[in-house]
Amino acid sequence: SFHDFKRTPDDLQGLHDYLADLDADVVKIATLANHPNDNLRMLELVRSSSPPTVGLCMGEIGTPSRVLAGQFGAAFTFAPFNPEKILAPGQIPWKQLCEMYRYDAITPSTKVYGVIADPVGHSLSPVVHNAACAAAGIDAVYLPFLVPKGHLGDVLKNSKRWPLAGLSVTIPHKENVVGFASSQGDLVEEIGAANTISFDDETRAMKVFNTDVTAAVAAIQASLAAQEVGFGGRLGLKTVLILGAGGAARAIAFGLRQQGVEVTIASRTVGRSQTLAELVNGKVVEWSGRHRLPYDCVVNATPIGMHPKVNETPFEAKHLRPYMVVFDTVYNPENTMLVKEAQDVGCKVVTGVEMFVRQAAEQFKIWHGQEPPEGVMRMALKQATSSVRIIE
């Protein structure tokens, strides 16, 4: 066996040949992944090698190599029975590997999906999509792919070498991913951001979609309907302050503008705020001035308050008013600092859980061509975080 806790060597084949010549029954190679494609190089080595080979990439970037080891022909993988006794960086506890990822059911024909993000450790997309696939009897597995911003192009250019069928896209890739697509779904060109990739089974052509727009508006409508007697389905909002100017902010701003809402953008990068404001015929305020004017609704479309930095908020509590609607797109945790403080003031609150489940359900339809088990998806998210509920 061979271990390298710093990198994945360039000449994996040469290393394997050296170990195989030692008259080994099984060759094991474990290296640290510094690039997402290190997983691919390792798995391709496993698939083409004799004698039987176990090739694993360590670290968070290396997660796919551990889950897909069997699909590529590895003799076995490693998983600690006790999650408190992780012996190597990136090891996945046995229960998670077997129950969430269904490792024993993965075969060469299993379709692979995942989420590309940086960071990705907080994402509960694997929990939700794997539960949905299991409930629907779909032969698929959904993985977290840690893809730093500078590596997006390399990963997508090599996507044909993976058994990938589709990807969710989140921070920081929602805007950049559009430029790599062969085709686009509705609204993507107008918004300039996508959160979903589908790969054609035969041509491997990449089509991008945006399921955030309808999910965001529907989440607000559903939450307000539950909190307002006689709510007729229209938002009833006149002015909305959106915090952030990234992919999620773009989708929400576009969806709200379609509802006739006046949108104001505030982010730490004025240029990005101006670009988004022009897209939706909205206004811009500097980040430092976001508290100065009253709004019917405040939307947090930044990662502020996301796990593990749960004690941060993008909007100071002293500026919240009881008549406001507060929508936080962060779903992990569901009850962010912003949500708690808005609830204390008496605001109507929309948590990120409803938007998350709705956009994931639309992704499920795109990938699998059937209605999603939304109840299962909500329950999986509920078990992973806190109770899914409308806060009154």
Where are these regions (language model features)?
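Rossmann-like adenosine-cofactor binding region
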Residues: 278-349
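Glycine-rich adenosine-cofactor-binding loop
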Residues: 57, 112-120, 210-213, 220, ...
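Conserved beta-strand positions in the Rossmann-like core of class I SAM-dependent methyltransferases
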Residues: 143, 264, 350
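Rossmann-fold NAD(P)-binding glycine/threonine-rich loop
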Residues: 324-374, 379-380
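Conserved S-adenosyl-L-methionine
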Residues: 258-262, 345-348
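Phosphate/diphosphate ligand-binding glycine-rich loop within oxidoreductases
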Residues: 110-226
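Catalytic alpha/beta core domains of metabolic enzymes, predominantly
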Residues: 1-109
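NAD(P)-binding Rossmann-fold cofactor-contacting core
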Residues: 259-280
